[in-house]
A protein has these predicted regions:
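Domain-level signature for soluble enzymes in the chorismate/prephenate branch of the shikimate pathway
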Residues: 1-149
Length: 149
């Protein structure tokens, strides 16, 4: 049986992941065309490389289809409920940083804090009879942040 390592399948995260492992004596490379999700591992026996989107890696870890994965902590926290009980971070790789921010249109000159946003949302709901919507792909992280604000 081999260990299955999930890594990002494209872009800067894949390149940085391959470079990080290469610097530690484990060579990762794509095999086949750019459209194929095939890869090879050199420098260590018993390790199978699985190329996935960074967003799929948390779920594949949780499901047990991969044993190790390289992805962002933002994606782990967003995709997995009670993530602390489901996965164990092993190494901080030092790349792929992401800042999550709450932004409003420039014309909202009176909204400078989360409390201001809360007031604007309350006024919006009273006027329009439905809630103000926040566009995000990080629903859980935004909800946790706003509940704690």
């Amino acid at each position: 049986m081999s260990l299955r390592l999930g890594v990002p399948s494209k872009g800067r995260l894949m390149e940085k992941t391959f470079a990080w492992f290469g610097a530690h004596g484990i060579m990762l490379s794509r095999s086949g065309s750019e459209r194929e999700y095939a890869a090879e591992v050199h420098g260590i026996d018993g390790l199978e490389l699985v190329l996935l989107s960074a967003g799929e890696i948390p779920r594949e870890l949780q499901a047990g289809r991969i044993h190790l994965g390289v992805t962002g902590t933002d994606l782990i926290r967003e995709k997995l409920v009670n993530w602390e009980q489901r996965v164990e971070p092993l190494v901080e790789l030092g790349f792929g940083h992401a800042d999550l921010i709450i932004a409003v249109p420039d014309c909202w000159v009176d909204v400078e804090t989360v409390d201001d946003l809360d007031g604007a949302a309350a006024a919006f709901r009273q006027t329009h009879e439905f809630r103000l919507r926040i566009a995000t792909k990080y629903h859980r992280l935004v909800r946790e942040f706003l509940r704690g604000a």
